[in-house]
Amino acid sequence: MSLCCDLQINLNNQFTFFVNQDLISEYSGFLRKMIKQSNKKKKNHKNSRIIIEVEDFPGGSDGFDLVLRFCYGGGISIDVSNVSILHCSSVFLEMTEKLCSSNLLLRTEKFLEGMFYWSWNDIVLCLKSCEQVFLHADSYGLVDKLVFGVLAKIPQNSDVSHVFSSSSPSSSASASASSQSPETAMIRSYSDKRSTSRSFSCRTSNEWWFDDMSILGPKIIEKLINTLGAHDKNNDSLVLTKFLLHYLKTKVPNKSTNKLEYSGLADTAVQGVVFAAKTAFSCRKMFWVLRVLSGFSISKESRIGLERVIGEMLDQATLDDLLIPAGGKGEKGVYDVDLVIRLLKVFVRIGNTEEGDQNLRMRRIGKLIDKYLREISPDQNLKVSKFLEVAESLPDSARDWFDGLYRAINIYLESHPKLSSEDRTKLCRCLNYKKLTLDTCKQLAKNPKIPPNIAVQALKSQQLSNETRPHSREDKNKVNKIWNSRKYLEEKPILVCLKGFDMSEKFEDDLMMNLERKQWNNSEKVSKEKKSEVMSRSVRHGHTHSSSSFPRLC
């Protein structure tokens, strides 16, 4: 051999290896072909070193180094951590039995044949190593083999027939039977034999594998989903949906995360949530799902479906559920107010088509939205139009009283002191003055931030409503005493200064004092008349000096 290293291999335009061409040709059919082609081009330079370019080699320099060690007889140990790289490298380099016996490809295939005897951790580790050479491993069928191995291992430790079938077993069994591969049919059959009537809510029996599988990349998980035939709209498995939610929770998007890689998994999770939402997920859980999945660029269709389910049960939400931080795409404000508006529209639309306890649900959501408005009012980026859009999303029947909404308006006015008079007037249009309690109406009238015309309008509405609907026994007494003295007001008009409405308390006190004085005079007059009548009766009967015959007047 004239040159020990007469072959230069430039690998993936990054690494260079110097090897003996005769030795490497004994094991690799791919390199043998390239060497022959290079020799034909260099007939006049027989003693010169041959240079060949190898691109898109799986495993990079580490993988090629393992191959060279095998060819040079250095001995390599095939295990679950390197078998995927060695298998893909041997297929790429065509290291078959045609060249030499017990070549590298045959050895990796024999090792993979024992996959169904591997431990659970070994299969997961091998799948993880496939991520380095995923495109090659997938095209060579290695990923499919490992996925089938994982799916066969899961039922050995849990009853997860629902992973491989619909949440309602009869819904799609016949439809999917014809499209099953032999491996999938075997896994389904194996899991069906082990299925029992145990509950699937137990984390220890059905979800023990969630954390282990969460170390895998999105491409591997998508392969698993596709193998089960549950991709996107075909997902009707509750356990699989829970796994996807758990998986995506551990992959919270950040600067180094490609959201598009997970968008398909997020859409599949949404379909599973929508399919089993009302029976498997509470309202709070649904908001958690929305928070998790919104960061992965889910499709418009998936978002609409998810918001529809949440909107239908919105009356079960709490204030914390609604306080979802605003997104970063040009959305101003602390909280995602547009989301709440969309959910309210769904709730109201569904409420108009349902009967029964819808009025109770509507009043419950009315109280919740008033609390929500009070919470978001201090936000300096919250526009008046957006505040009104939230407040006016509900009909008047959703609020027995508008006191809570007035308090939200007051907080907004205090937090936005530079608001114009026009905007302050506009802000108050969502109030139903007839549904304000007497105390709240008095507060509104004295509030210097409320435009005077609004205060007058509220007081007029309060007069009309109080005549027909007093709020309490104490208010009823006040209302009767005040409005029964209108004749007195007509006879003695009073100048009213609207500025600041500081006259309201003094006006009521004067009114009450005059009314009590008139009532006392009337009572004293009646007492004197009765006393004189009794005295005249006593004189006629000759008992003028007997005080015992006088009746009690009070």
From Swiss-Prot:
Keyword Transmembrane among record annotations: no
Gene3D superfamilies attached to this UniProt entry: Potassium Channel Kv1.1, Chain A
Pfam families: BTB, NPH3
InterPro entries for this protein: BTB/POZ_dom, NPH3/RPT2-like, NPH3_dom, SKP1/BTB/POZ_sf
Region (Disordered): 522-554
Pathway in which this enzyme or protein is active: Protein modification; protein ubiquitination
Bias (Basic and acidic residues) ranges: 522-534
Superkingdom of origin organism: Eukaryota
Domain BTB, residue spans: 5-80
Domain NPH3: 207-465
One GO biological process term: protein ubiquitination
Ranges annotated as biased composition (Polar residues): 545-554
Domain notes from UniProt: The BTB/POZ domain mediates the interaction with some component of ubiquitin ligase complexes.
Known function: May act as a substrate-specific adapter of an E3 ubiquitin-protein ligase complex (CUL3-RBX1-BTB) which mediates the ubiquitination and subsequent proteasomal degradation of target proteins.
Family in the record: Belongs to the NPH3 family.
Name this protein carries in UniProt: BTB/POZ domain-containing protein At3g19850
Organism expressing this protein natively: Arabidopsis thaliana (Mouse-ear cress)
Classification of source organism: Eukaryota, Viridiplantae, Streptophyta, Embryophyta, Tracheophyta
